[in-house]
């Protein structure tokens, strides 16, 4: 399994001949190395409905005939835009032909904001994502605060790599993310959701230096690890 980071919260997984992308915020993302028109994908996994996570989902899904796996309300909202979806909810899991997906808790918000019409559409609860294939598990925490049930994620799952937000302001900051890493018990921890905007500027190298009992790895956009 090849796992690549592409800036902000964009993660690409290549496994068993399939390509899965999590939270494909590409257009307007100053930290990504990808262009939406160049991306080939079989499945898109979404943690929540904010624009910096849904990103180019509709375009990518339609162009590639890819299924979008998302929390129920967000999946329904996207299905109304002509996208093929598979709705799920927190605590539920499903075996797809590309791997197993399970949604976990996340403490954040989830909505579609229409700036032009000044409306906000509720898109369900935010989530973290556990993805398992080839006997390897990736945990993408989505946007979240620190919460004590991260201990359960670590106890119930053998997490090979965890992507944790460290940007602060909208999510947990580096200090809380260090504790999250301890609780999740991942073998490798990769920081995400930082330095995309001024308000979430952080030093990822300082973060990984504080990690204990795991390997911290800063991935630049386009870099990957093999599990």
From Swiss-Prot:
Cross-referenced InterPro entries: Metallo-B-lactamas, RibonucZ/Hydroxyglut_hydro, UPF0173, UPF0173_UPF0282_UlaG_hydrolase
Entry superkingdom: Bacteria
UniProt KW keywords: Hydrolase
Pfam families: Lactamase_B_2
Presence of keyword Oxidoreductase: no
SMART domains assigned to the protein according to its UniProt record, in alphabetical order: Lactamase_B
Keyword RNA-binding (UniProt): no
Gene Ontology molecular function terms on file: hydrolase activity
Family in the record: Belongs to the UPF0173 family.
Name of the protein described by the UniProt record: UPF0173 metal-dependent hydrolase BCAH187_A4741
Organism: Bacillus cereus (strain AH187)
Lineage of the organism: Bacteria, Bacillati, Bacillota, Bacilli, Bacillales
